[in-house]
Amino acid sequence: MSDVAVDKHATSLVTNLIYQVNGVLPKDISLHHSLVNDLLMDSIELIDLLMCLEDIGVTVHESELTSELTVGDIVMHVESIH
């Protein structure tokens, strides 16, 4: 995924939600970071993030919650509703 092709608003929204859920500063988050392996999100934080996303109309199925799920994957979900 090219960083240039990604909507900056969607990226900002996702990185700020991640910050709210687990405290990693948005400036330290890359689209290529794995939520589990790189950002060290635990299962409770992942569910919190899913709930925050659902509040803004974005659905990520629990079956997608693997250690391979990246910030960029979440951004693509957000972009798909706008």
Regions found by a protein language model. Name each.
Residues S2-I44, L49-H82:
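Phosphopantetheine-dependent thiolation modules in NRPS/PKS and related acyl-activating systems
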